[in-house]
Amino acid sequence: MSEDDTSRQGWTALVLAGARPGDPLAAAEGLAAKHFAEIGGASLIARVLGAIDQTPWIDRVIVAADAATPPEALEGLTSKPLSVVGTADGAPATALAVLNSEAGAPPLVVTTSDNALLTPAILKHFIAAAHDENIDLAVGLADSRTIRSRYPDVQRTYLKFRGGTYSGCNLFAAKTPEAGRVFAFWKQAEALRKSPVKLARLFGVRALFLYVAGLLTLDQAFALASRKLAVKARPILIPYAEAAIDVDKPSDLELARRIAAGKA
């Protein structure tokens, strides 16, 4: 298939852009929301929308935002049809609400407004892989070796499995309504994302044992999750280190600025 195969068109992009009260980056930059911080003269959210705008398989865009991001702040940031909706109680609940709406009907690719190093190449790789799989949901991950080979000093939270360690990329592809079960579970698991052992416990004693013993592979983890949630979920490895570098704190912003300027 060619890179611009029309069979892959028809996607909607959801950008999760809710502001977190007391966000340290927003406070440090004196902004209403951290995604208004700039890299190379463009805000984080403008960079995300710009990458989406240059991805031909995405037809329309939904931004889920709160009062910190009025619709007029997004004017001119994409040439694709754009709608702005409110946020629910956290990112997982927001993603679920949008997926269940008419506007957010699958296929839906989900990312965040702080995913400032997102590029059309990353999106194309992810969407192409998700499109070609018979699945309900795809989750973008980057191998730690991919990240450290480019940016050896970068600090990320890694999930350790037999055969590799991986970082999330704030990229999800919902291909069917059944993906909503994962978003509902994500809401429950979100508080545990920095504690892989507690997260594994949610999937049962066997998953916990295998994880703690270092015997659980990435594919096994997704197979266990798929059975528990009655969905077909798959990981998609993204060969771009930048996909795993979101902007959560001032040091992340500095790193992203260096990367964008070609100085990292």
Question: Which residues does each predicted region cover?
Answer:
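Short phosphate-binding loop-to-helix
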Residues: E75-L108, L117-L118, K124-H125
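Short, acidic, metal-binding catalytic loop of nucleotide-sugar glycosyltransferases
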Residues: A51-I58
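Conserved core of the sugar-phosphate nucleotidyltransferase
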Residues: T119-R227, I238-E242
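Short, conserved phosphate/pyrophosphate- and ester-handling motifs at nucleotide-, phospho-/glycolipid
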Residues: K249
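Active-site acidic Asp-centered loop
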Residues: T111-S113
